[in-house]
Amino acid sequence: MKNKQHLISNRAFWAIFACFSFFYIRGLFTLIYGTDATIYASLSAEMMETKNWLQIFHKGNDYLDKPPLHFWLSAGSFSLFGVSSFAYKLPSFLFTLLGTYSTFRLGKLLYNTQVGKISSLLFYSSFAVILINQDVRTDTILVGIVVFSLWQLITYVQTSKWLNLILGFIGIGMAMLVKGPIGLMVPVLSLGIHFLVKKEWHNIFKWQWLVGILISILVISPMLWGLYHQFDLQPNKEFNLASGMEGKGTSGLKFYFWDQSFGRITGSNKEWKNDSSLFFFVHTFLWSFLPWSILGVFGLFKKIKESVLNRNKHEFYTLGAIVIPYLAMSKSQFQLPHYIYVFFPMWFILAGWYVYKLTETSTWYIVLRWIHVLLNFTFISVSVLVLTLFFPTKSIFMWLPIFTGMIGMTYLYKNYKGKIQLIYTTLLGFAIVMFVFSFHFLPQAVSFDGPYQAAVKSKEFRVNQLFSNNAQSLSFDIYADVNVTYKNVYQLQDYTNNGNYIFVNESQIADVLKTYEEKAVYEFNHHAATNLKLSFLLESSRSNTLEKFYLVEI
């Protein structure tokens, strides 16, 4: 049995990292799906074409929702590689690599090298991080930047090196450029709570923090300029917010600094509300932190218990970054699962610390071991279920990894003992289900994207112009070779008989067929990959859940 000082060797670390990297690389080429991701990709493509970097528009309309960094990076990537899934997702994946390395360095800084290794592997192999590299939103970049900022700033506190201070506040500025004030609040709460609990008054009142604040302001200044000129200087401008509410009179700066984040917590923002419960993020954590959810819970409560009993021996950076943001987000009137991912790296550090400290003869270790045996059985069962009941396949390419993995798991249970067995078997069990998820389940699910199918079909024709009046068909925009013009169905009389097509959903097809003498009609089945209910997953009932989209030559 390996002792706790050498739980994971360098060779094992890189082998595990390489294994899970296959899932990330596969995700780079998976279809862009989901409402947010398709909006962001479409907006980024428009930004690339218009070269309007500071004032943000979507389909020619003013856009006031997310800050611009994600769009800047995606637009830049589109310029280099063309508009594609790979180009859209690549910047986010690179920031995930930065987040993984930063988690390692921060875990090493706060504890030791082994905790750093364990924490970074837990982070990189977690469902949440893999998922947000498939369904790419602003949070993917945010997570990597925030943990990078914390690593740099905590290093600065310990070494007083200016470079770390500068990099830390550049990171905070970039985090604010990608998701707003939350990019500032998590680092501030992390350091602030630690300083207050440890009574490190000299660290609170460092004059160098003022320099750092100026650096962050400088980083976000292009965005502030754009918001001010696009909205605050034009208070009578008529536009709609992302929710569809009228935006006339909305201050861009106030929206950014208050409404978008704190307004949702206090209730002053009436734009977004989904009445989620105080416990919404409890079950969110349990599925998104997989396969390390129980380690995360045990690690958090052990850290709280030991910190209360002896605060002088413990750091409070991790608790500061987790507890207050978690409680504040739980009170928010609008909650989505990915909101809590911003402090997951710190939580993975606590989970890694807990594994390192865990005594293999303790009752808690025995409980953990049996829970993870059950988890591994569940992972394999789910994999088999997907391949037999949801999206049946006889492909040896899909089944071989499951059988090989089961043999490997038997070997690990037989030849390894203690915590190393728990870590390795769980990683292997989760790798099996993630292989099925990344290479079979998700590609099959997104293949039912009707707008994407229509875009692919349009490439078979000599298309002059493409039209649509369905604002939720943005994957059609992204993947079509011809720019899509949005017009009402009844506004196309001057565009008939010239190789033009209109893309509509089933509620609009009757109007098109009644108004125009169609030359060809192509029908596509559709189901949103972000709304996967059992009725869709079961092959026997799937046809009853499908919507229809149509591509019509007019």
Residue ranges of predicted features:
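Membrane-embedded architecture of ER/inner-membrane glycosylation machinery
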Residues: K2, I166, K302-N483, K487-I554
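Membrane-integral, polyisoprenol-dependent glycosyltransferases
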Residues: M1-Y365, Q444, A528, L532-L534, ...
